[in-house]
Amino acid sequence: MNLHMLLTSSILGLYLHVLGGDQLMGHYTANLRDIEFCLFELLGRDEILGKSIYKDLDRDTAMGMLEEIKRLSENDLAASFVEGDRMGVDFNPATGDVKVPASFKKSYNSYIEGEWWRLDTPPELGGTKIPASLRWAIAEMVLGSNPSVHIYASGYAFAQVAYYLGTDEQKKIAKLMIERHWGASMMLTEPDAGSDVGAGRAKAIQQADGTWHIIGTKRFITSGDSDLGENIVHFV
């Protein structure tokens, strides 16, 4: 999908949202002028646009993306921030199911339906290639509005890891992660190893059938469970 199609899809989603009569409101206001200054006047990122791997991206298109994610962040994404923060997730010990608040699911789906996940997806799997500086400018607004949306949507970025660094079998899993919109978790933290991941003591022992037995403790699992998708791939 090219950049113009991505923008058209996202803008259409916003139009239908307003047409349906939903009230748009939120706690967050993005400083787009500051972001524009940092990207193009301070860092001069427009110098790399329109060339090589970014030949289909110019400054106007980049600004269009920023303006659209600003609208989405200030409205749809921000709308569930308070309720999501106060309620958190609901865990059913009898079934083991985890559910996020309905309002948060609505915010998350607005991000996914706008196809912003393509920015974290390998081009070979339908992703859209943009400079890292622009990608993180977009992420800044999503994180400022509703951090959990960005974190839960990181499954697509994890699919990149599996696709570029994984085995042939793991590459197939990466494709499924994209096609079926699976989530992903990152399991690093241990009781005695927080930011010092080198202090981790968990061990993985490969078995004859190709599986691994993991011995140890992991905690504070990022986006470890939810009902946002049919499956979650755990990166340990």
Predicted regions and their residues:
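Contiguous, well-ordered alpha-helical segments that form the cores/surfaces of helical PPI scaffolds
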Residues: 136-140, 156-161, 186
